[in-house]
């Protein structure tokens, strides 16, 4: 059966403990709502705040919605500056962290169950 689902960030998103205190990560699309092939998270990371470090067995992509942050290579420590309007592509098993001040939208595809382990 086909269906269309519209998700509102302010009402429907699920808070996830994936950022340092002061940052906020919210799942917009995740397995708990029936999504099996895709996940999408909203990262709001103010100046001085960061996501936790990730390493997925799948590809991941992020779009920078607002701000000028960084994506940090967890293996080398190299920081890559990013700004609104840019896309970040990460290969499978690439460790990384997102740093503010920026808003990022994205995640691994398919969903990485470890991101949702505390809520599933």
Name these PLM-found stretches.
Residues 6, 27, 40-44, 61, ...:
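Conserved hydrophobic/aromatic beta-strand scaffold that supports enzyme active sites
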Residues 37-39, 58, 101:
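A structure-centric signal for secondary-structure junctions around beta-strands
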């Amino acid at each position: 059966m086909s269906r269309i689902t519209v998700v509102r960030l302010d009402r429907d998103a699920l808070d996830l403990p994936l950022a340092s205190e002061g940052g906020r990560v919210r799942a917009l699309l995740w397995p708990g709502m029936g999504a099996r092939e895709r996940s999408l998270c909203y990262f709001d990371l103010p100046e001085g705040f960061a996501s936790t470090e990730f390493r997925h067995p799948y590809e991941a992509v992020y779009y920078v919605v607002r701000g000028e942050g960084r994506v940090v290579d967890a293996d080398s420590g190299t920081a890559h500056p990013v700004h609104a309007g840019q896309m970040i592509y990460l290969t499978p098993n690439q460790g990384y962290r997102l740093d503010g001040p920026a808003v990022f939208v994205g995640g691994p595809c398919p969903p990485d169950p470890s991101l949702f382990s505390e809520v599933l």
